[in-house]
Amino acid sequence: MDFIFPLISYLLGAIPFGLLIGKLAGRDVRLEGSKNIGATNVSRILGKKLGFATLLCDSLKGFLPMVLAATLLPSSENRELIVCLSGVMGVLGHMFPVYLGFKGGKGVATGLGVFLFLSPAAIAISLGVFAASVFFSGFVSVGSLLASGLIPLWLYLLGASQLKIITAGFVALLIWIKHRKNIKRLMTGTEKSWKKK
């Protein structure tokens, strides 16, 4: 029965809040901008307020399933594993949502929720990395890649458990894989800068 939590986490993670918020505003974010359902594209198309709303909702898809699993599961050998797996499944749900033919977002906001549960201190450090990276480079993708990629290191330095470090590393890897087109555009100089309107 413990493994019902990861399944529920996937189904919750698959809820496309960016698309739903866009629809409520009369727009289909899959047809505009980067055509991504994530907070960055929603912000570009619909403004910062709705972009932030998307960021918050998508982050909760990673955070809340882990909170629920940690709260409802009794203490056992598998408790930390189920909690971490629930976070991973929330991210996979966002990236590959069953409701949208498995075509979803890049997982940064949902990953943020997972990382926040694993270590608020690590998130605080990586948010600083994100802000500095975006400010100096002009690219949100650079900030997302660096911030997520460094989370496992911060967890290691902060003395987190091996399972938490592995979980963070796997989520970061998923985020990097979903950003492969951004990485290619960064290498060819064709990535869109946040500073350019």
From Swiss-Prot:
PANTHER family: GLYCEROL-3-PHOSPHATE ACYLTRANSFERASE-RELATED, INNER MEMBRANE PROTEIN YGIH
Function: Catalyzes the transfer of an acyl group from acyl-phosphate (acyl-PO(4)) to glycerol-3-phosphate (G3P) to form lysophosphatidic acid (LPA). This enzyme utilizes acyl-phosphate as fatty acyl donor, but not acyl-CoA or acyl-ACP.
CC per GO annotation: plasma membrane
UniProt membrane topology term: Multi-pass membrane protein
Entry superkingdom: Bacteria
Entry EC no(s): 2.3.1.275
Keyword hit for Repressor: no
GO MF assignments: acyl-phosphate glycerol-3-phosphate acyltransferase activity
Entry keyword set: Cell inner membrane, Cell membrane, Lipid biosynthesis, Lipid metabolism, Membrane, Phospholipid biosynthesis, Phospholipid metabolism, Transferase, Transmembrane, Transmembrane helix
SMART domains: G3P_acyltransf
Compartments it resides in: Cell inner membrane
Any Gene Ontology biological process: phospholipid biosynthetic process
UniProt record similarity statement: Belongs to the PlsY family.
Pathway: Lipid metabolism; phospholipid metabolism
Subunit structure: Probably interacts with PlsX.
Reaction equation(s) it catalyzes: an acyl phosphate + sn-glycerol 3-phosphate = a 1-acyl-sn-glycero-3-phosphate + phosphate
Designated gene of the protein: plsY
The protein's name: Glycerol-3-phosphate acyltransferase
Entry coiled-coil feature ranges: none
Transmembrane segments annotated in the record for this chain: 1-21, 50-70, 82-102, 112-132, 159-179
Pfam families cross-referenced by the UniProt entry: G3P_acyltransf
